[in-house]
Amino acid sequence: MEDFVRQCFNPMIVELAEKAMKEYGEDPRIETNKFAAICTHMEVSFMYSDFHFINERGESIIVESGDPNALLKHRFEIIEGRDRAMAWTVVNSICNTTGVGKPKFLPDLYDYKEDRFIEIGVTRREVHIYYLEKANKIKSEETHIHIFSFTGEEMATKADYTLDEESRARIKTRLFTIRQEMASRGLWDSFASPREAKRQLKKDLKSQGQCAGLPTKVSHRISPVLKTLGHMWMDSSRTATLRASFLKCPKK
């Protein structure tokens, strides 16, 4: 699974996921299913915000090619992927600027058009069950919840799906592709089933063997939204701008 993750996801997403796990004392080389889940959640969060802007009239528009006009504002503020201290700094700044209530838990995005925080969920189970779990945990009407599944289902607060159908279809297609690629490599069952995942983890801990090598050819899709946010994720010793691409899993 670890090799699959490193081949299937953009290197910057992989790096952010590794940092997030290490922040909580977790090892991505051992908890590989969780590693895959975090990478998937990050990519969905980034895809959710990608290409969406607000024009000078306050209208939400989509810009898919080239650099957006300077008058355009990113519709979504990305919170997911930042270290906790920076993430809370961003949340506090948004709350102070907009007057929205501060969430109890860190959300994934902020929607400047609808003036609300968004919690993104990606589940291997039934969407309504996961939605209820999220809602019960958050217990806040100010945080909008949007759940996606690997089977193409989705569920959102008050059936308000925020994005246009095409943008959501792109996310669903990506999730379905990840599922198919995992299944073709015999990884899906352990990823989808907690019991099977626990059994596989024990097996991996005993063997510490490497997974079969995967093809290295990948295709890149540039994300203009994340280009401008790159420096927010960088360590102080790094000055390069973040350029995240959304990768399709390599073909067999």
UniProtKB/Swiss-Prot annotation:
Report the subcellular localization. Host cytoplasm; Host nucleus
Instruction: Specify one Pfam family.
Output: Flu_PA
Per the record, the GO terms for biological process are: viral RNA genome replication; viral translational frameshifting
Q: What superkingdom does the record give?
A: Viruses
- Active site positions, chain numbering: 80, 108
Annotated site residue numbers, Important for efficient shutoff activity:
202-203, 206
Among the GO molecular function terms of this UniProt record, one is: RNA binding
Q: Which residue ranges run through the membrane?
A: none
Where is coiled-coil annotated? none
Per the record, where is site Important for efficient shutoff activity and nuclear localization? 195, 198-199
The UniProt keywords, alphabetically, are: Decay of host mRNAs by virus, Eukaryotic host gene expression shutoff by virus, Host cytoplasm, Host gene expression shutoff by virus, Host mRNA suppression by virus, Host nucleus, Host-virus interaction
**Functional note:** Plays a major role in the shutoff of the host protein expression by cleaving mRNAs probably via an endonuclease activity. This host shutoff allows the virus to escape from the host antiviral response. Hijacks host RNA splicing machinery to selectively target host RNAs containing introns for destruction. This may explain the preferential degradation of RNAs that have undergone co- or post-transcriptional processing.
Q: Domain comment? A: The probable endonuclease active site in the N-terminus and the basic amino acid cluster in the C-terminus are important for the shutoff activity. The C-terminus acts as a nuclear localization signal. The C-terminus is recruited to host protein complexes involved in nuclear Pol II RNA processing.
Q: Which family does it belong to?
A: Belongs to the influenza viruses PA-X family.
Protein name in UniProt: Protein PA-X
What's the source species for this entry? Influenza A virus (strain A/Swine/Iowa/15/1930 H1N1)
